[in-house]
Amino acid sequence: MAAPGGRGRSLSGLLPAQTSLEYALLDAVTQQEKDSLVYQYLQKVDGWEQDLSVPEFPEGLEWLNTEEPISVYKDLCGKIVVLDFFTYCCINCIHLLPDLHALEHTYSDKDGLLIIGVHSAKFPNEKVLDNIKSAVLRYNITHPMVNDADASLWQELEVSCWPTLVILGPRGNMLFSLIGEGHKDKLFLYTSIALKYYKDRGQIRDNKIGIKLYKDSLPPSPLLFPGKVTVDQVTDRLVIADTGHHRILVVWKNGQIQYSIGGPNPGRKDGIFSESTFNSPQGVAIMNNIIYVADTENHLIRKIDLEAEKVSTVAGIGIQGTDKEGGAKGEQQPISSPWDVVFGTSGSEVQRGDILWIAMAGTHQIWALLLDSGKLPKKNELTKGTCLRFAGSGNEENRNNAYPHKAGFAQPSGLSLASEDPWSCLFVADSESSTVRTVSLKDGAVKHLVGGERDPMNLFAFGDVDGVGINAKLQHPLGVTWDKKRNLLYVADSYNHKIKVVDPKTKNCTTLAGTGDTNNVTSSSFTESTFNEPGGLCIGENGELLYVADTNNHQIKVMDLETKMVSVLPIFRSENAVVDGPFLVEKQKTLPKLPKSAPSIRLSPVTACAGQTLQFKLRLDLPSGSKLTEGVSSCWFLTAEGNEWLLQGQIAAGDIENISSQPTISLQIPDDCLSLEAIVSVSVFLYYCSADSSACMMKAILFSQPLQITDTQQGCIAPVELRYVF
């Protein structure tokens, strides 16, 4: 197919015909009617004398997840292509990703469909390829992506907002556009009928596109894009949202892990720690051995009980909500992308902790979850478990107002509480307006503190300027924390790669640490140390230390507010890890030789497809009264002799610390399968003592799981229970 001779035309050329189609679809009742209408529409636009042709990708653009740059009129010939115009800071763009993931799992390039992300930056920081690489990893983007830093394609097509999807036919001809989020049904309808229409005409090709996933180059690290961190003021433990590993860590102040809950893969499951899963958790708050978690991409608030070692859901239904008022009981109340949480109080008692304040980034609001019956300002008595909007209209704005429901936020992403007078407020890092705002705990009034612009609709007033009030400029701040000792507010000025400090009395905002460079430097001087998109921070050690989630450096940085030194908190397990610089390197567990007496159990074959996760649940019973030997690590190993590619990048060994709470072993089938048959083995070695400790012994067992891999989409795979009584 030859490239069109003329310049590509804008999306406005599609508007009349597609608008008529969408009005007709409103009146369609059956799926057959809808399919027919879309088919007729394609006949119409395909018959136009001149295609609405997309321009070629400009030369010299930076590509990710591909072996080489992609050409519209060479590589994409014979494909239905979905162009996703997005920017990685945008919550609406993030909301769209699950729809694209679902589409990728339904149709592959062999079926004739390809998705290409066209990154068109809002903030200057988002034009930098390294920062986009971090976003690709953080959001598990596996389709090809191009960094259109100058927004050339955006301007050629006259795209107007993020996100926008443009669906192309096999000649690079524009067929449909979808603006904003929430169009999953239309996306699937349009792409499925387009594939059928052009297959009927023999114009779809099944050639594969050269994919090379950037995530395969990621080095091992104890943390992966940690989003938030908080301190248990009673024990000085830290709670870390290890966002990229989809888990919550509870660590002692020396960095030793006490609990690891969830991970390494995303999921949505309550229960005991070894079985519970999260999906890109962000905000965390801890009090009395209870942790509340903003489970962002699950659209849930989760509760972790450290004493019972269980996880439960207290708000949200597991899918993105659109309700902007709320008022239902937590588990029945849909919510949208909660990004941070902080404890508050409904009465005059300071720090009673009967309210959980929520930065609801997805609906641009501040919500409240009642942990006990109580009252909010200007509200009647509310029952325990009620989850509702407190401030924000739901419009994406930088609007301050004495009436909380008339105020507007723009993706609030960080919260901190100053309950004492004269402050008595929530501090809010309002990321998309590049401001810090306050919400009064007495009447809900929303006020400006620093950053941004007076025009409530101007969300482009960002920069890196120390100053007072509106003269100070921030760039997409994601975190705030209140220093009660000094009456100062610390701000994670994320896209400026700095930590700033604000005096709320004078509204003076100055740089505390960071140079603005994204190098990973620790120093005896705050001003010489560097950060890379820090996402969260908290005060610890009675106001002496500031802990920073240095997100893109995959670290927790420790800032000593007295000595002005910056260091890295090592994250390690007590005996099974050593620290080598910023990365944790697990001591390589060596698979012991199985004793001849060890039973070998061959399981029934399991069928799975690429991308699915197979779970093995250990269910081993010791003789009555026996207990695991203290000081000796009972352990498990995952092997795949002759098919080691199955285990690449997976956790292939681990400890068994408690016989009453045995781990679940996860194996995700890689997207690129080198064989359709394999045998996966689980070897278990248990060291235990009899009830009276008169005899201690080691027992082992081998489970062999035949695996058949298919390219046909499978339903949910039931966990495989590995049972044996010793």
UniProtKB/Swiss-Prot annotation:
Residues 43-200 form the Thioredoxin domain. PROSITE patterns: NHL, THIOREDOXIN_2. InterPro entries: 6-blade_b-propeller_TolB-like, NHL2_NHL_rpt_dom, NHL_repeat, Thioredoxin-like_fold, Thioredoxin-like_sf, Thioredoxin_domain. It is found in: Cytoplasm, Cytosol. Signal peptide: none annotated. CDD domains: NHL-2_like (cd14951), TlpA_like_DipZ_like (cd03012). Gene3D superfamilies: Glutaredoxin, TolB, C-terminal domain. Ubiquitous. Detected in heart, kidney, muscle, brain, lung, liver and in skin fibroblasts (at protein level). GO terms for cellular component: cytosol; extracellular region; platelet alpha granule lumen. It comes from the Eukaryota. NHL repeats lie at residues 212-254, 265-307, 335-369, 409-439, 461-505, 518-562. Its main location: cytoplasm. Keywords: Cytoplasm, Disease variant, Neurodegeneration, Repeat. It is linked to Fibrosis, neurodegeneration, and cerebral angiomatosis: An autosomal recessive, early-onset and fatal disorder clinically characterized by progressive cerebropulmonary symptoms, malabsorption, progressive growth failure, recurrent infections, chronic hemolytic anemia and transient liver dysfunction. Death occurs in the first years of life due to respiratory failure. Required for normal embryonic development. Monomer. This is NHL repeat-containing protein 2.
